[in-house]
Structures are given as structure tokens and as C-alpha cells.
Swiss-Prot record:
GO terms for cellular component: endoplasmic reticulum membrane. Signal peptide: none annotated. SUPFAM superfamilies: B-box zinc-binding domain, RING/U-box. The C-terminal transmembrane domain is indispensable for the localization to the ER. This is Tripartite motif containing 13. It comes from Xenopus tropicalis. Keywords: Endoplasmic reticulum, Ligase, Membrane, Metal-binding, Transmembrane, Transmembrane helix, Ubl conjugation pathway, Zinc, Zinc-finger. It is found in: Endoplasmic reticulum membrane. It comes from the Eukaryota. InterPro entries: TRIM45/56/19-like, Znf-RING_euk, Znf_B-box, Znf_RING, Znf_RING/FYVE/PHD, Znf_RING_CS.
Length: 408
């Protein structure tokens, strides 16, 4: 049909021929298309053209008006028949026998078949009907089938449908709850990982502080020695220009003091200060074997070469309030009791001398003995004060080291 339509198409308007006219060169065009060609020619030329060229072959054709051209009745009739065929519905064809129209109705199987199916196929011994008779028969059968559809009980289907939709909602709700659980699990895991990361990085900061404390002390000592050495060199340069004997001798004394300090200053060995020897073998790949539920076990390696430490971290954390309170009490006792009492002993001795003189005016010897006793007691208490200060300092240093070591 498409190939036929190409032959029935006007070359100018590319549509099916409408009142086709044939030129002397045998080419066909629509009447209205030729009118347009002639009108265009008359506009472009100052005088009336005596001929025009065929739009297809460019052959000259005498101008005698489109109405004077011969109508191609044969082509016009073919176009009209083609339009009727094109508008009419197409007859279905057989799927098993290509291009064979389904023009026979098998009354046995109640289906359309082609001639080949009726003679050679599985329908060979079936009962056949014409298309018209089959149409009437199936039309009456439609009413019977429609009544069966109306009488069909759909309540059971609706019941099953409601059950399925209810089960679907329950399943989706259950999946949503499980999805929320999974989301909460990973959010918790993410929180634990972030918390553990911050804890381990905090441990690294503690190690950095320990390294800085270990190295900075020795570095500062060496800087001090170098500074004193530069000062000593400056003193030597100044001594070369001093002519005053007294000033020279005074500067020489300062120079000898600095030289003594420089020579007696202890020099470090320059070796590495390993704060945590276990960190030498530290590798994050050792955490790969830890399960998700055991994220809390992630930690930096601990130094096992030091003194034995308490193993229960919870016990250490529980002692934190007690240690803090003990330190506060010790400081309070030290500063509120020791210092005011001991520092006031000399004044107390003088007051005691006055009181003794008042009560023992008749016995000067007893007063002198009493004053001597309290002077000796004051000396002993002053010695006790110094020792207490030393013990308190040592105790506070040990407490600070303990707190830093176990991160209380």
C-alpha cells in the first residue's frame, strides 16, 4: 500500500492527486498545484508567458490555461478507489499462514481461521460457518455470557482482595519498623565509632603532651646553658676593654660563676624518650578483627613494661571522686592549719613570755624554763612544717601522675 501511495502522490504538494491533469510530457499534477505554478510565473515575468516548464522534467509546455489541460481520469479513478480501500477496516490475517485472511469461522472452536487452517490444519474436520452467520450466533451468545458475568459472585473476590491489601499493609509496616531498627543500629554504631575515635585521638594528645614534657625540660636546660655560654663570651669581650682593676675583678668573678655553671650543667644523653614503648608496634590493621558489637574494645596499645596497674577501669573511675575529695581535704588542712599556726609561733612565744612573767613574777627561773621549752617546741614544729610541705608536694605529684596515667 505504501508503494502504491507513492505513485499516487503529486510531486508538488506531496499529497494524493486532487483532480489530476496530465501535461504533454505525460507528467501528472494536481490542478490547484499547476494554477500556483502559472500564477508564480506571471508575477516574475513582465509580459504574459507563452509557455512554462514542467516541474519534473523542465520541458516547455505551451500556456493554454490549466482548464485546457487533459484530465487524467484513469489516475483520478485509481486515487478514489485507493481512498476507499484505505478508509475501510483491514481484514485480519492468520498468524500461522502469513498473509492469509481470517475469513472463516470455526463453530467447533469458536474462533476465526483462514482457508489453509480449514483444509490442512487442526480444524480439518470441524464445523464451519460464514462470517455473517457467525456474527449473528455470537451476538446472541453475548447476552448469555453477559448475564453470567452479572450473576457472578464478586463478594469472595473482594474479600480476598481486602485480605491481600491488609496483608500488604502489615508487611510494609513491619518492613518499615525493621528499617527503622537498622537505621537506629547504624546511627548508634556511628555514634560509638565517633566517640571512640575522639577518645583515641585524645589519647594521642595526652601522649603528645607527655613527649613535650619529656623533651622540653632537657631542651630548655640546654638552651639555658647555651645562653650562659654566650653571656660568658660577651663578658670576655668586655673584660678585654676594662682598665679599672675593681671593675675587672668584679667582672672576672661573674665570668668564673658562669663558667662554673656551664661546666657543672648536666648534659643529657640525647636518646629518645619513649613515652609508650608499645606504640612502636601500633598498627590500625590490628583492629580489623574486632567485631561491630565490640567497638568499645578499640584502644591504643598500653605499656606493659611499667609497674603492674589495676586492671579494672571501672574501679579506677569509681575512685575518682574519693581521690579528688582527699586531695582537697589535704590541701585545706595543710594551708589552713599548718601555715597560720606555725607562722604565728614566734608571736605566740612572745605572748607566752608576757603571760609567764605575769603569773610567775615571784619565780623568774620557772618563767625562763617555760620560755625555753616553747622555743624548742617552735623549732621542732618548724622542722615538722618543712617535712610536711615536702611530703605534701611528693603526694600531690604522685596523685597528679596517677590521674594523668589512668585518665580519671
Amino acid at each position: 500500500m505504501e508503494v502504491l501511495e507513492e505513485d499516487l502522490t503529486c510531486p508538488i504538494c506531496c499529497s494524493l492527486f486532487d483532480d489530476p491533469r496530465v501535461l504533454p510530457c505525460s507528467h501528472n499534477f494536481c490542478k490547484k498545484c499547476l494554477d500556483g505554478v502559472l500564477e508564480e510565473n506571471s508575477r516574475t515575468m513582465q509580459w504574459r508567458p507563452s509557455s512554462f516548464k514542467c516541474p519534473t522534467c523542465r520541458k516547455e509546455t505551451p500556456t493554454m490555461g490549466v482548464n485546457g489541460l487533459q484530465v487524467n481520469y484513469l489516475l483520478k479513478g485509481i486515487v478514489e478507489k485507493y481512498n476507499k480501500i484505505k478508509v475501510s477496516p483491514k481484514m485480519p490475517v492468520c498468524k500461522e499462514h502469513s498473509d492469509q485472511p481470517l475469513n472463516i469461522f470455526c463453530s467447533t472452536d469458536l474462533k476465526l481461521i483462514c482457508g489453509s487452517c480449514a483444509t490442512t490444519g487442526e480444524h480439518k474436520k470441524h464445523v464451519f460457518s460464514s462470517i455473517g452467520d457467525a456474527y449473528i450466533q455470537e451476538k446472541s451468545s453475548l447476552e448469555t455470557l453477559f448475564q453470567g458475568v452479572e450473576e457472578w459472585n464478586s463478594k469472595e473476590v473482594h474479600s480476598h482482595l481486602d485480605t491481600l491489601e491488609s496483608n500488604k499493609r502489615k508487611a510494609l509496616h513491619s518492613l518499615a519498623k525493621e528499617s527503622d531498627k537498622v537505621k537506629a543500629y547504624f546511627e548508634k554504631l556511628q555514634y560509638l565509632l565517633e566517640q571512640k575515635k575522639n577518645e583515641i585521638l585524645s589519647d594521642f594528645e595526652t601522649l603528645k603532651l607527655a613527649v613535650m614534657q619529656a623533651y622540653d625540660t632537657e631542651i630548655n636546660k640546654l638552651h639555658t646553658v647555651l645562653s650562659e655560654q654566650r653571656k660568658a663570651c660577651n663578658i670576655v669581650e668586655d673584660l678585654k676593654n676594662i682598665s679599672d682593676p675593681f671593675m675587672f675583678l668584679q667582672q672576672m668573678q661573674e665570668f668564673r660563676d658562669k663558667m662554673t655553671f656551664i661546666k657543672e650543667a648536666p648534659l643529657t644523653t640525647g636518646q629518645d624518650v619513649n613515652v609508650n614503648p608499645a606504640m612502636k608496634e601500633f598498627d590500625t590493621s590490628m583492629w580489623d578483627s574486632i567485631k561491630l558489637g565490640e567497638v568499645d574494645k578499640l584502644s591504643l596499645p598500653q605499656d606493659t613494661t611499667s609497674k603492674k596497674e589495676p586492671g579494672d577501669a571501672k574501679t579506677l573511675h569509681s575512685l575518682k571522686p574519693i581521690l579528688v575529695v582527699a586531695c582537697l581535704i589535704l590541701l585545706l588542712v595543710t594551708f589552713l592549719c599548718a601555715y597560720p599556726f606555725i607562722d604565728s609561733l614566734p608571736t605566740f612565744t612572745i605572748d607566752l613570755q608576757v603571760i609567764s612573767s605575769y603569773f610567775f613574777t615571784t619565780t623568774a627561773k620557772a618563767a625562763n624554763l617555760t620560755i625555753l621549752f616553747w622555743e624548742q617546741l617552735s623549732e621542732e614544729l618548724l622542722i615538722l612544717k618543712q617535712r610536711c610541705q615536702t611530703y605534701v608536694s611528693v603526694f600531690l605529684e604522685n596523685v597528679a601522675e596517677f590521674v594523668c596515667k589512668y585518665k580519671l
